[in-house]
């Protein structure tokens, strides 16, 4: 099979595209000559695969890191201190939790959240989120069981270089993305399995081509591909979907064509949702090879947060939103020593989930700080 062979795949019958609604620009009425950005909630519903699927909710928050006030300045009843200036933008997933009957109460609970931000270091620079106060509405979510969250500094913080030692910082969530989805989506791609490489395996990767709508003079445009004469810019993100093994049976040819048919028979459908931040979803709607099954749950689904796969691209999605333009399946040797002497086999136009094709952010982009 030639390199970059184009093999058309069946597209979903329903081409109506749903999208994550952008946060509109909503400012408060002037108070003492100042206006403030109002907290906002975006709701997305992902339908279950079958009637018996249990529903849960995912909460992801976007907001700002500010230096904590030290109270060494003058304060009076008539002159109350305002918020400290924004240091940088930040994302913090609250994780999965129970169904919420009154999602509008989430915004009321944001002011009661107290989350401190500190730096640390191991092999890489790290950010620590210390949850010291959490309102009742968030108690059933993953964040309530994990009062100290440690992540790589580039993962959730827009500009970690602005956070200094000797200063206390707090995270102020402002925008909330609430996703109703089946429990079958509560699975991230298994990172340990993704690192396994062997000569008796073939790796299947997904190349997701994302389109960003931004101006030519935008700073992020320098890190993206200009789409010829068309509007917008494009980014290529690779996701490791699974490995499949080569067989040792005699009198049978196990070439690129054989493994290509395996890929086509799997019929992967790709989507883009907001769960752990912008997240790529994969659903195997066809035949699952036995050796690929450990990479998915029992319903053939897996999720790949962009903050894990490509943190820089994830941050662009905070600022400008994005949509899936095309998905290609890549067949590659698993063992690194075999890659230099082989071609990548490309299967173009993997079907995209029409219900989860877009990821849009705020019209006003506070996350560019």
Swiss-Prot record:
Recorded name of the encoding gene: M
Compartmental location: Virion
Intrachain disulfide bonds: none
UniProt similarity note: Belongs to the morbillivirus/respirovirus/rubulavirus M protein family.
Role summary: The M protein has a crucial role in virus assembly and interacts with the RNP complex as well as with the viral membrane.
One Pfam family of this chain: Matrix_Paramyxo_C
UniProt keyword list: Viral envelope protein, Viral matrix protein, Virion
Single biological process term from Gene Ontology: virion assembly
Keyword flag DNA repair: no
Cellular component GO terms held in the UniProt record: viral envelope
Superkingdom assignment: Viruses
GO molecular function: structural constituent of virion
Record carries keyword Nuclease: no
Species whose genome carries this gene: La Piedad-Michoacan-Mexico virus (LPMV)
Stated name of the protein: Matrix protein
């Amino acid at each position: 099979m030639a390199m970059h062979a184009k093999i058309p795949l069946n597209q979903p019958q329903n081409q109506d595209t749903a999208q994550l609604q952008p946060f509109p620009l909503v400012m408060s009425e002037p108070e003492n000559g100042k206006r403030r950005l109002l907290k906002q909630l975006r709701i997305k519903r992902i339908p279950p695969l079958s009637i018996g699927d249990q529903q849960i909710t995912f909460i992801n928050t976007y907001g700002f890191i500010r230096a904590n006030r030290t109270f060494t300045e003058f304060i009076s009843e008539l002159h109350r201190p305002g918020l400290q200036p924004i240091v940088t933008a930040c994302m913090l997933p609250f994780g999965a939790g129970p169904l919420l009957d009154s999602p509008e109460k989430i915004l009321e609970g944001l002011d009661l959240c107290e989350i401190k931000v500190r730096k640390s270091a191991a092999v890489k620079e790290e950010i620590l989120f210390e949850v010291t106060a959490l309102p009742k509405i968030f108690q059933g979510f993953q964040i309530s069981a994990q009062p100290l969250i440690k992540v790589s500094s580039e993962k959730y913080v827009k500009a970690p270089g602005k956070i200094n030692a000797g200063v206390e910082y707090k995270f102020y969530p402002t925008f909330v993305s609430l996703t109703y989805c089946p429990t079958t989506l509560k699975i991230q791609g298994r990172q340990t399995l993704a690192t396994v490489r062997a000569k008796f395996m073939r790796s299947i990767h997904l190349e997701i081509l994302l389109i960003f709508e931004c101006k030519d003079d935008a700073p992020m445009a320098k890190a993206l591909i200009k789409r010829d004469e068309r509007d917008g810019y494009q980014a290529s993100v690779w996701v490791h979907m699974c490995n499949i093994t080569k067989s040792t049976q005699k009198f049978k040819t196990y070439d690129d064509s054989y493994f290509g048919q395996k890929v086509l028979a799997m019929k992967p459908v790709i989507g883009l949702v907001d769960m752990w931040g912008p997240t790529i979803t994969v659903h195997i709607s066809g035949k699952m090879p036995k050796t690929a099954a450990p990479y998915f749950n029992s319903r053939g689904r897996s999720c790949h947060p962009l903050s894990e796969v490509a943190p820089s691209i994830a941050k662009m999605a905070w600022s400008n939103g994005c949509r899936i333009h095309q998905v290609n399946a890549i067949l590659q040797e698993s063992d690194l020593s075999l890659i230099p002497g082989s071609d990548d086999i490309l299967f173009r136009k993997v079907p995209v989930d029409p219900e989860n094709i877009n990821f849009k952010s705020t019209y006003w982009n506070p996350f560019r700080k």
